[in-house]
């Protein structure tokens, strides 16, 4: 068995399968996607998995929460002895720097959570005894993933820690603080964690910067920016939560976010308005093209059908109309629903 294992939001397997197929074809690697709706993962079977993984950077994949290279598929595992076949399948492999035992984030996969936790505790000492796992986690070495699809069915895969999600299942466990104006705050928190590298976050999100939040009410995204000590112009005809205004970092303008423009260039513009995705993409492109902002994070609400086609169309439309040299990344975040979050920054 050789291929890529990618986790995704349950119900978005067709979109991830289409994305992997299109991207693999673009780089000239043949393969096919194996999945079923609501599995919570896609297995892209190909003979050149390592080469494909190197060309498809995790941060560049839209619908993949995690990207792993499969090294074995085990079926019919004896529940009384799962360790022996796993050790046999790993014979000759290099020493791994960490072990994550996982399951798909799906209705069928979640009941396997307790098995994953307990089995990980049993497998670690066996791997160390066999010389397959370091005594302490070593993030610079490849990470071993055991993904249980059922009690007797598992995929063994490896991750490059520099090119994979740093969270089990690819899900950052963010806590919604009581003072957050809305749950949408988690979207921007996750976007900053996922779409930017630590070095980019440090360089691009600094105290004293200026930003606009279009369609800001009740203030979730504005609040996230103020916690980074960014000055925010919040544009919305609706009200903001009082404690957001009390930060002293927020100017609330009662205006239509689709028509407002700043008097001077801003460091950031963020937008989570509920609107047709193509209309949003065009307006965001105008902001970049006119130089109204240097960097932007915005959401695109996807239709129920042909979501991969709409995603590609909107991103192409944005990049064409922006008329700038940009680094563009997009993800369907864990805290997103029927939408994707897009980052665009000056190249």
Swiss-Prot record:
This protein's encoding gene: rlmM
Broad enzyme group: transferase
SUPFAM superfamilies: S-adenosyl-L-methionine-dependent methyltransferases (SSF53335)
Subcellular location: Cytoplasm
Stored Gene3D superfamilies: 3.30.2300.20, 3.30.70.2810, Vaccinia Virus protein VP39 (3.40.50.150)
Record function comment: Catalyzes the 2'-O-methylation at nucleotide C2498 in 23S rRNA.
Listed GO biological process terms: methylation; rRNA processing
Subunit: Monomer.
GO CC annotations, alphabetized: cytoplasm
Protein name from the UniProt record: Ribosomal RNA large subunit methyltransferase M
